[in-house]
Amino acid sequence: MQNILTPKHSTYTVSLCFDGGAAQRLVDAQKRLAQICRNNFLIEHSVPPHVTLGAFHAEPGALPKLQKTFDGFAKEAREVLGGNGLDLEFGGTDSFLDKVVFLAAKKDSPSFVSLKTLNEILHQKFLPLFEAGSNKNYLPERWLPHAALAVKLRPDQFKKCAAFLGHASDFVLPQSARVAALSLALCKPYTELCRAAF
């Protein structure tokens, strides 16, 4: 008999990671919003700024296969990007369901096309082996590339964030950020398992 408190699988993400300068600018923005809306989930859980390409469920014993698949994807991603990483252009702030505030990738930019290509390749490699996670929101047909600024917001916190972002002239968000690596991470608790630099 299986213990009902023991999950059958864990959720893992494959994400794009920013270089040190870009990551710090995004952390500074996350901290400022955390002060405004009184929600510091991202800071408290030490989740570095990133763009999630995909989320997948895997059984506990599947970690070696997951890491091998990640390594194969990282090699292909380097080829797609010419081994140079990616300068990601942002198009401004947006939100999901009044619970997440994020910086969206600029839709009419070359970097957006590269992101969509990476997302499609990732799912071609991972879906035959692993189940899509996070309510399938990262599947190519549903995915909107973004870097989260605040998550798990209550309605009152979301209103504070939205009001602040709509009127804060001194709050400057980055227009672009350098993507320097890929990471494979366990979601709960957030734990980076491996990283592949471009």
Predicted regions, residues:
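Short beta-strand element of the conserved SAM-dependent methyltransferase core
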Residues: L16, L103-A105, L184
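Basic, often amphipathic N-terminal segments
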Residues: M1-D87, S111-L173, T191-F198
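Short loop/turn segments at strand-loop or loop-helix junctions that form parts
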Residues: G54, T93, A105
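Glycine-rich beta-strand-turn "strand-cap" elements at beta-sheet edges
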Residues: E89-D98, A177-C194
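A short small-residue
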Residues: H50, K99-F102
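Short histidine-centered catalytic/ligand-binding loop motif
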Residues: V101-S111
